[in-house]
Amino acid sequence: LEPKDWGQADSETDSKAPEPFKRVTRLSQHIAFLKDFFRTYKNFTDAQLDTIEILLMKLYARFGITDTTDYRQKKPTDFPVMSDFYDLCEEEFMTYDKKRKYLYTEEILQEVCLGIHSMCVGSESKYFNGHTNITDDSFLCFGVKGLLDTNRRLKDAMLFNILSYMSNKLLGEGNTVASIDELYLFLSNLTAIEYIRNAMKRVRKKDSAVILASQNIDDFLIPSVKEYTKPLFSIPTHHFLFFPGNINPKDFQDALMVEPNEYGLIKFAERGTCLYRCGNERYLLLVQAPDYKAEIFGSAGGR
């Protein structure tokens, strides 16, 4: 619940961009993100999400956090955690007075409490309930291998949470490089793909960069996600295209705008061989790791 910085909205902001990228203040940006976050975690209705927004505003007000707050003076422990949010929701539900008029109903409050219980105080709270405790972030790696064994909504919510931390560094602080390996993990959450796409468009203004990596292009060409993923291939300045595997050559060429003669350079599996593109320039490269880097890789992960 610590408000993240999503960069400043400007005239170049895409009208189709996620809501946080179009808001002005840091708090309004983060509350807009949290609505998408809760929608990712549970399929809340619009009325439930609007209720969550009202309750979040009440929660931040209790902690003295407003649109004019100076976040440079704040420590992670100055912000609420998920259990604080659940306590507020439960309090609103328990003290609901049917004789008064509210913007939300008692039933909606009950549904919200049930929906966020596991995340805030239940079995899944260990992933979400706590203050940001990262102190040394000059080089940071989020290991998400264990997420593959969780349910889809928990995985999507956790990846979305990591994405908010990365966006804060890329667009808020700047001069940061974020590398997202195994990008296919995000494909079950199309909202996250939109966030990544919009961050990629804005990072250059903050002297930041985004690196995307994935092994199988097939995952990105599924009809239900193709509309969202195709822009991800056109935004990067540099492309390293390796052997694409067992895929329809035309699909690959259309998605990455590769000419047939360029595809011919990488259509066979040759370790380390790739087509490098930058603007109008094309190079056939042989990528080799020097001995000292090869040692860093260790013995895990294939040969």
Please annotate each region the language model reported.
Residues 215-218:
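C-terminal amphipathic alpha-helical interaction region
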Residues 220-303:
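C-terminal regions of RecA-like/P-loop NTPase motor modules
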Residues 1-208, 212, 265-269, 274-280:
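P-loop NTPase motor domains
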